């Protein structure tokens, strides 16, 4: 893969750009496989530290910058400079999976918006897109292992692993992950982080 990337950098043309797209997909699948292999005890690799939602979102957007640009994506970031305590690597992976799905299941002129809400014990991150949405029949199963649903079968090759792994990681980090959707209108994924003070009070 490294050799192929060097070749692409040295000779950019429509063919090598298509190869670059496929290499990015391979990178994504490899990352999913590695997380899946460690999913039973992934918390051993956690490094819980102070960060901000803005840092996590920027890191995930950087990873998916090229496919976002190719999809005409326009990320909108609203009031994300909010401190949280979390494992940055795992949270960036989860946000990246959500961005990846927004790209896969987009309509023309992809829009993806990041917004927040805070209360006494929780900080919520909302990630909303204007894509094709998820059917009411599929929505309860989006976190099932291997579930691809109608969208996965019709529009895009899908492993059905990304959201499954994201849910497992979030549970281990005491983050509540949920999905709501209006078919044909878009999808909103919500990550609810416990505040640092709440974690201390709960002894977590």
Model-derived regions: residue spans:
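Short conserved segment of the HATPase_c
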Residues: 134-147
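Short conserved segments within the C-terminal catalytic ATPase subdomain
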Residues: 67-76
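Acidic ATP/Mg2+-coordinating residue in the GHKL
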Residues: 129
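Short helix-loop "hinge" at the ATP-lid/N-box region of the Bergerat-fold HATPase_c
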Residues: 102-103
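Conserved micro-motifs of the catalytic ATP-binding
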Residues: 41-46, 83-87
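Glycine-rich ATP-lid/hinge loop adjacent to the conserved G-boxes
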Residues: 147-157
């Amino acid at each position: 893969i490294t050799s192929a990337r060097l070749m692409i950098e040295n000779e950019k043309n429509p063919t090598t750009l298509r190869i670059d797209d496929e290499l990015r997909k391979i990178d994504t699948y490899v990352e999913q496989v590695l997380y899946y292999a460690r999913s039973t005890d992934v918390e051993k690799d956690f490094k819980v530290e102070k960060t901000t939602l803005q840092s996590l979102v920027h890191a995930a957007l950087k990873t998916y910058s090229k496919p976002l640009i190719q999809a005409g994506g326009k990320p909108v970031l609203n009031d994300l400079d909010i401190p949280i305590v979390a494992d940055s690597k795992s949270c960036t992976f989860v946000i990246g999976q959500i961005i990846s799905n927004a790209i896969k299941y987009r309509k023309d002129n992809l829009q993806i918006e990041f917004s927040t809400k805070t209360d006494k014990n929780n900080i919520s991150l909302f990630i909303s897109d204007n894509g094709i949405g998820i059917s009411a029949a599929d929505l309860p199963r989006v976190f099932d292992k291997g579930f691809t649903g109608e969208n996965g079968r019709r529009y895009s090759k899908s492993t059905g692993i990304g959201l499954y792994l994201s849910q497992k990681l979030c549970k281990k980090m005491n983050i509540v992950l949920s999905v709501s959707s209006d078919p044909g209108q878009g999808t909103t994924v919500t990550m609810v982080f416990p505040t640092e003070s709440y974690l201390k009070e709960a002894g977590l």
